[in-house]
Amino acid sequence: ADQMKDPNPVAMADIIKTEELLSFPYNARGISLCRGTDWLLPQRIVAQMDPEQSDLFWQNSKSFWRFFIARCENELALRIIGSLGFVDLKNLNDSEQMRIAYREALLHFVKEAEQASCTGEDIEKLLTEVYHASPLSKSPLECVVPPDSPLRLGIHSNEQWLKTAEERYSSVYLDILGLISIGRYRQGDQLPSHAALQLQYGVSVVTTLQAVKTLKQWGVVETIRGKGIFVSQHPPAADQLPLSQKMVASYVKRYLENFELLAVTAEGVALYAAQSVSPAQAQALRQTLFDTERTGRRYPSYPITILEFLVEQIPYKAMQAVYATVLENQRMVIKIPGLVSSENPAQVLEMNRRCIGAADALAGGDTVAFAKRTAEMFQYVYQHIIEQCDRLHYLHAVKGLYDTSLLWK
């Protein structure tokens, strides 16, 4: 305990706000998904919260809230929220009286929230009540944290959110396959050199050699000594390649998790992002969408343009890092064979219409409508991607390989 330090007030304020923007909507969603026996575990956790044992009491409180986030079965969201530093925080402005009151609030919360008649609005109200009984609502929050805690250092890197056991080289060759499938590289085109690929993907020469070797074995590229790497004159179609189902399924899973995170959190995030937007910036967003429409460009798509705009405008560094990671992960779409080429034109038009509607609201100074429309647009996109993945039989593959209910059961 003597290793513990005071948090940095600036980093802490930033992360508390980020935690609210992520946890609040995810808790609400997790609660709304709970049915019948799902409630047994949270009930058991509250029952063993002893106000006389401070450390254990707060440990159980953290497990209680983690359960509802895990109930959403989104591993990316669970990892991100878990990495914000609250797990290791030791609460100081804490009395037995406060613990008794907080436990009472939790008992009331569980009793009310598990009623079948409990609506989304009821859940939000209940969450707000519990929040006011918790130490997080006490200002200033007195606590100590480990020396390397994000509550001291802030969050800049997203390394820990992206670690998966997937081979690095598969990421490189799937990306190249995707770029060929969307026409970025055509037959006979020269690909970047190994040195350039290493820089582009942040990998070693061993990784790029392995990736190019795989593409060569499949007849996708040819290498000419002293000249470089070229796309073959007759590269096979993506559906004829012996791609590992497990690998493609892992990308589908992460891609879906990214968009679900947007669908769940975008309303709160967009509302805060919009607060500092100048009329000129709002107009510029509208113009960017208009130019995309006029030139008939497909990349970046309208939803990605809105996401880029949010990343620029989010006032909290940690939240900005989260959305920047989601933006980076959008490139995954080209690693999933058939996903880009199977776009439904009518649905793409509807997505674009919704993006323009959101931008119009912002240009008109209505930040609440902007936030609402942005969230609805990402929810629509998320549903559209689920349908596409289902049509391509990817959902079945993901379910066969990953039992996401293990996150909470």
Residues of each region from the PLM?
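General nucleic-acid-binding
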Residues: 10-14, 43-47, 61-65, 70-82, ...
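Helix-turn-helix/homeodomain-like alpha-helical modules used for DNA recognition
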Residues: 6-54, 124-135, 249-289, 370-372, ...
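Flexible internal linker/loop segments at domain or repeat junctions
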Residues: 237, 241-254, 284-288, 321, ...
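Short helix-adjacent coil turns
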Residues: 34-37, 49-56, 73-75, 104-126, ...
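C-terminal all-alpha effector/ligand-binding and dimerization domain
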Residues: 96-158, 162-163, 336-409
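Short, structured motif recognition centered on aromatic/hydrophobic residues
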Residues: 15-26, 61-72, 76-92, 176, ...
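Conserved amphipathic alpha-helical segments that form helical-bundle/coiled-coil interaction surfaces
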Residues: 37-91, 125-137, 279-336, 373, ...
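Short linear motifs at protein or domain termini
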Residues: 1-21, 151-260
